[in-house]
Each structure stands twice: as structure tokens, then as C-alpha cells.
Amino acid sequence: MSSKLFCLRSFPSVQRTAWQRLVLPSTRKFSLTPTTFDKTPSGRIPPDQKAANIISSVPSTSLLTKSGVLTVTAAALATAISKGIYVVNDESIVVASFLGLVGVFGTLGRKAYNEWSDKTIAKIGGIMQAARNDHTSAIRERIDQVASLQEVESVTQALFHTSKETARMEAEIFELEQRVALAKEAKSVLDSWVHHEANVRAEQQERLVEDVLARVNSKVSTQKFQQDALNESLGEIEKVLASA
């Protein structure tokens, strides 16, 4: 009873149509003259296109499998209705309407989802392409930087030879400085020895002079030396007077 009330409240057009079909007399007029019907009236989908849409909506991959699924489903439904296993009632109408609404929303949502997924995929693809381009440009810049250092080996070798020559010259300069310092030290030692020898000689000469003077004074102070010197002086005077 509740399902009937829900059906009457939710689908008044369905209830009205069923009532008109059951109660009201048929007002359709029949004519014996042949009438030509338009198979594709305006505003309606052709049967072949509708069949193609139904077949394409079946979840399968091949056309044969889709046709088999539809055939088996229709046969099972007809068998269930004919055997009384399944009875069409208000609940069936509600379920069918719900499934129809779900199908409509699914179709509309599929389009929106496809658009959203396409935009998302395009956005992610753009981000990945931009990252790829940035990575490619970074690699190219690095390759250019490395290419500019192709002559680094020759420059390094030249710097190595220069540093080696500089080290050799510094060693020679240090050796010369040591030699100059040694020569200065030897000169200072020799100068000190010369000065010492000069002092020693001066002292020896002074001692010799003092010794000679002492000896002379000692000889001069003797009586004999004075007498000999006086006699020699007198002899020299006599020689001078004789020659004059």
C-alpha cells in the first residue's frame, strides 16, 4: 500500500496514463484506406539508431557478446513473466524509474566526468610537459657549460708545469739565500779572525818594541856601553877634524 501511494505521489503522469488506457474508451479511428507512415518523424530517434545506442550501452567489448547479453536478458525476463516468477507491480515501476533516472544521471555525469577527466589529464600532461621542457633545458644548459670546459685539460697541464717551474725556482732561490747567508757568516768569522790576528800582532809588536827598548835601555845604562859609545863618538869627531 505504501509503495502504491509513493508511486501515485511520485509519478502522477504514469497513474493518469494507465487510468486513461483502462477506463476511457478508445478514441482511435481506423481507416480502411492505406496510409503512409513516416518512419522517422521529426523529434524522434530512428529505430536503428536507438538499437545501436542500446547495444553500445551494454557493458561488453564485442558486438556478438553485446547481442548475446541482450538476447539472454530478454529471454530470461520473458520466461520469468510468463511463468509467474516475476510479476510487474508498483515496486517494479519504481525500480525501473529509479534505474532510468540513474541511467540518465549516469549518462549526463559521464559526459561531465569525461570533460573533467580530459581537462585533468590535459592539465597533468601540461605540467609534465613543462617539467620535461624544464628538465631538457637544464640538461642543455649543463651540456653547454661542460662544453665550454673542453680545454680545461690543456689549461690544467699548463698550470701544472707553471707550478712545477715555480717550485723549482723557489728551491733555487732558497738555496742561493742559504749560500749567501753562509757566505756572510763565513765572512764575519774570517773578519773576526783577522781582527783577532791583528790585535795579536799589535800586542806582539808592542811587546817586541818594549823588549827592544828595555834591552837598549839596559845596555845604555851600563858603564861599558857608555864608554864604548863615548870612544866611538870621539873617534868619529877626530876623523871629521882630520878630514877638514
UniProtKB/Swiss-Prot annotation:
SUPFAM superfamilies: ATP synthase B chain-like. F-type ATPases have 2 components, CF(1) - the catalytic core - and CF(0) - the membrane proton channel. In yeast, the dimeric form of ATP synthase consists of 17 polypeptides: alpha, beta, gamma, delta, epsilon, 4 (B), 5 (OSCP), 6 (A), 8, 9 (C), d, E (Tim11), f, g, h, i/j and k. It is found in: Mitochondrion; Mitochondrion inner membrane. One of its GO terms (biological process) is proton motive force-driven ATP synthesis. It comes from the Eukaryota. It comes from Schizosaccharomyces pombe (strain 972 / ATCC 24843) (Fission yeast). Mitochondrial membrane ATP synthase (F(1)F(0) ATP synthase or Complex V) produces ATP from ADP in the presence of a proton gradient across the membrane which is generated by electron transport complexes of the respiratory chain. F-type ATPases consist of two structural domains, F(1) - containing the extramembraneous catalytic core, and F(0) - containing the membrane proton channel, linked together by a central stalk and a peripheral stalk. During catalysis, ATP synthesis in the catalytic domain of F(1) is coupled via a rotary mechanism of the central stalk subunits to proton translocation. Gene3D superfamilies: 1.20.5.2210. Belongs to the eukaryotic ATPase B chain family. The keyword Transport applies. GO terms for cellular component: matrix side of mitochondrial inner membrane; mitochondrion; proton-transporting ATP synthase complex. PANTHER family: ATP SYNTHASE F(0) COMPLEX SUBUNIT B1, MITOCHONDRIAL, MITOCHONDRIAL ATP SYNTHASE B CHAIN. It holds the Pfam family Mt_ATP-synt_B. Keywords: CF(0), Hydrogen ion transport, Ion transport, Membrane, Mitochondrion, Mitochondrion inner membrane, Transit peptide, Transport. Its main location: mitochondrion. One of its GO terms (molecular function) is proton transmembrane transporter activity. Residues 1-36 form a transit peptide. This is ATP synthase subunit 4, mitochondrial.
